[in-house]
A protein has these predicted regions:
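Conserved beta-strand hairpin/beta-sheet module of binuclear metal-dependent hydrolase folds
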Residues: 1-50, 167-180
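Divalent metal-coordination and catalytic microenvironments
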Residues: 10, 24, 33, 64, ...
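A short catalytic or substrate-binding loop motif that flags glycine-/basic-rich loops and adjacent residues
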Residues: 14-16, 137-139, 159-162
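Residue-level marker for buried hydrophobic side chains located in beta-strands
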Residues: 30, 61, 85, 175-177, ...
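Metallo-beta-lactamase
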Residues: 36-38, 152-236
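Active-site HxH/HxHxD metal-binding segment of metal-dependent hydrolases
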Residues: 49-143
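C-terminal functional module detector
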Residues: 233-251
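C-terminal regulatory/interaction regions
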Residues: 249-305
Length: 305
């Protein structure tokens, strides 16, 4: 899929295959999803290619506060302060925590370095952790961002992957932006769960998105799933991946495997696609957390060996 890619008349997919941003056109423009800082310069070139001036962009939408969904925005906000950052009300605490922001910016720096080492990008902004990250507009379940010309973006809370994870539904386009709320996907057909926060909330969130039944599902990685059948397939496959993982963890526990042994197996099998850019120790930590969340769901306590 060559980028920029026209998803609908009013929505354009930008960024890269691995890290997506969406340009949404109303009377003004919004950018949904913020990718990593390494995508900043290619993204700005794409805007120029589309003849979209910065003055036309009014809102920058962060659907959850993980570094790989927000780090193009520091440069944009610094250059163009009229752009308003939109995110969950839960992020007031995160965006004012120097310690948390330092971790976010450090993770972004590591991924940017990996992108350079692999020749995916040649340069990137040199960002330094701020004392706070701006949050101009907070949203919650049922909030609406009206961009004009019928482009009303309604927000839904879809926790599970993270407590602050949001979806955004544009009914006029039949488009649901799900960020990472619908699990991880790597083309062509590899689905796996990502409930770092809570398993039961992840299940409810996917069921909520299935009830919306969008025509198009826009992910934060690997682009837009166009067509109701494909959107349904993606939501169902990610829902099934949760069930499969629950069964897998229970089976391994019953066979006497330790959390560390299960984590080693999962890390090897699940760290595919854009996750290959992550440091190995970070992937290990994330998949161990997924296993721990699964055990918590079942009320199983295990001592580490």
């Amino acid at each position: 899929m060559l980028l920029p890619f026209q998803v609908t008349k009013n929505i354009t997919l930008l960024g890269s295959e691995l890290f997506n941003l969406y340009l949404v056109k109303g009377e003004t423009y919004a950018i949904v999803e913020g990718a990593v800082s390494g995508i900043t310069y290619p993204f700005l070139e794409q805007l120029d290619q589309l003849n979209v001036p910065p003055e036309a962009i009014s809102h920058l939408v962060i659907l959850h506060s993980h570094f790989d969904h927000m780090m193009v925005f520091p440069t944009l906000k610094g250059r163009y302060p009229w752009m308003k950052i939109v995110s969950s009300d839960l992020n007031r605490a995160i965006f004012t925590s120097e310690r948390t922001l330092a971790k976010i910016f450090d993770s972004d720096r590591k991924i940017t370095l990996a992108l350079k080492e692999r020749g995916i990008i040649s340069e990137a902004p040199n960002l330094h952790p701020p004392t706070f990250f701006p949050l101009d507009i907070t949203v919650q379940e049922g909030s609406v961002l009206d961009l004009g010309k019928g482009m009303k973006m309604e927000y839904l809370e879809i926790p599970g992957h993270s407590p602050d994870c949001l979806g955004a539904f544009l009914e006029s386009e039949g488009v649901l932006f799900c960020s990472d709320g619908a699990g991880f996907y790597t083309p062509p057909d590899f689905f796996r769960p990502n409930y770092w926060y809570r398993l039961d909330e992840a299940e409810k969130s996917i069921d909520k998105m299935k009830a919306i039944d969008p025509d198009i599902l826009c992910r934060g990685h690997y682009g837009a799933m166009i067509g109701k059948d494909l959107a349904r397939k993606h939501l169902q496959m990610n829902r099934q991946s949760i069930e499969d993982f629950k069964a897998y963890v229970l089976e391994k526990i019953n066979e006497g495997y330790s959390v560390e042994e299960i984590t080693q197996d999962v890390t090897l099998r699940f760290s595919k696609g854009f996750l290959e850019l992550f440091p190995p120790e970070q992937n290990y930590r994330l998949w161990k957390l997924l296993i721990q969340r699964t055990l918590e769901h079942f009320g199983i306590e295990m001592e580490e060996r």
